[in-house]
Amino acid sequence: GLDSIQDYVKLPTNFGATIGRYGNRINQGKITIDGVEYQLPRNNYGHCLHGGSKGFDFRVFNAHQLSDQVLELSYLSKDGEEGFPGNLTCKVTFSLTDDNAIDIRYSAETDRTTVVNLTNHSYFNLDGDPSKDNSDYLLTINADAYTPVDSTFMTTGEIAPVENTDMDFRQPTAIGARINNDFIQLKYGKGYDHN
């Protein structure tokens, strides 16, 4: 980890953050709910990324330790926060299991129709040495398809097969083995940052 909370805030990667109200991008920052169009902050290539300029990664959650191995965080996102409609109460529960796995569970309640897509930006350096990168880590992803993006990193709506592409991690493959290849999706995503 980093030495201070200020070091985390300075990172552009949402390092370790809970992401919301809406993880990923909303095209042109526009949503329509019940016939009403809402304009959200356009904080990333003209799109709304991770809930806007002041998404959940910039909010202070209330912490409740439920047991030695369980921490629950809660937050009330008020109606209109970052342009989103409805009061949204969300909870994130972090549990450390007996076999040393981290289990993250999300729940949310709202008082009106809205959008919500919570996620987490945890990153792990399994070497324990922050000066080393992860390019030699073997990665397996049990997925036959991915969602391509355009040059503004917005998903195109296509669901593309991974077979015969640099996105194919169905067999253990070093993360860095193909990351510098001339595959347009690696250029658009600045590496592997796709669904």
Language model features: what each stretch is:
Residues 1-195:
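An exposed, glycine/acidic-rich loop-and-rim segment of catalytic or binding clefts
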